[in-house]
Regions:
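Active-site micro-motifs of SAM-dependent methyltransferase domains
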Residues: 87, 106-108, 137-139
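Conserved N-terminal segment of class I S-adenosyl-L-methionine
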Residues: 1-95, 103, 117, 219-233
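A short SAM/SAH-binding and catalytic strip from SAM-dependent methyltransferases
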Residues: 99-112
Length: 233
């Protein structure tokens, strides 16, 4: 299961698309919860790749120094850089980070996936953490969003990621029948604290996954490297 399309969406598309993320939503809030638990109140630097309207920043602990890059920023600030990171390397000057997060990004990178993993690995400090979300395309009721140009199974995405990172945790965003994130306060509270896969059901009902990973030290060319996946659920 791998479908790659070389049609990439440019700034005009993302100016409108990012408006959908200008208010809090469940995946963002759960990402913030994961990040804050990893940070444990420590002072550190974070890069949000594909930050959109930077809503994540408002849910993070105040000791986390937020930086963001996006192809279509809605605001300008010293901690934000507008760039097309499919046309140019992912970076923020010469800065390196304790945490790099990419939500709703890798469904749109087409054939650039491995290159972007490599660039993110280089941005992390020793002991750093990369957090990436990815849609579960095996969901029983999943409809493929037309702009997606990088469609693959859970296993395919994890194998690719594991060439560059040790995957230490895989967390479902939620388990839902209709492939929509929970909206009621009760259901949000239940799924917000769900950090394990439900046996026999996760592959068909998990909406998305968060992959939490630490960088591998490159010893060979990426094309020759075939490590085992470290998965702790």
């Amino acid at each position: 299961m791998r479908q790659i399309d070389d049609k990439y969406y440019k700034r005009d598309f993302w100016v409108k698309e990012n408006l959908d993320y200008a208010r809090p939503h469940f995946r963002l809030e759960k990402a913030a919860r994961i990040i804050n638990r990893i940070a444990r109140g420590k002072e550190l630097d974070l890069l949000d790749v594909g930050c959109g309207p930077t809503m994540l920043m408002h849910f993070l602990h105040n000791k986390i120094h937020y930086h963001g890059i996006d192809i279509a920023l809605h605001d300008s600030a010293s901690n934000l850089i507008e760039m097309d990171f499919l046309e140019a390397p992912i970076k923020f000057g010469d800065k390196r980070f304790e945490i790099v997060v990419a939500q709703g990004v890798f469904e749109y990178v087409g054939s650039h996936q491995c290159q972007k993993f490599s660039e993110i690995r280089q941005l992390l400090k020793d002991g750093g953490t990369f957090i990436s979300s990815y849609v579960n395309f095996h969901h029983v009721h999943k409809l493929i969003y037309a702009p997606y140009n990088n469609i693959q199974s859970f296993d395919e995405f994890q194998r690719s990621l594991s060439q560059f990172f040790h995957v230490t945790k895989v967390i479902p965003t939620s388990h839902r029948w209709n492939h929509e994130e929970p909206t009621s306060p009760f259901k949000k509270a239940v799924h917000m604290h769900m950090n394990i896969n439900i046996p026999f059901f996760s592959s068909r009902f998990a909406v998305e996954y968060f992959f939490v990973a630490s960088p591998r030290t490159p010893k060979k060319k990426e094309s020759e490297f075939n490590p085992e996946t470290a998965l702790n659920t």
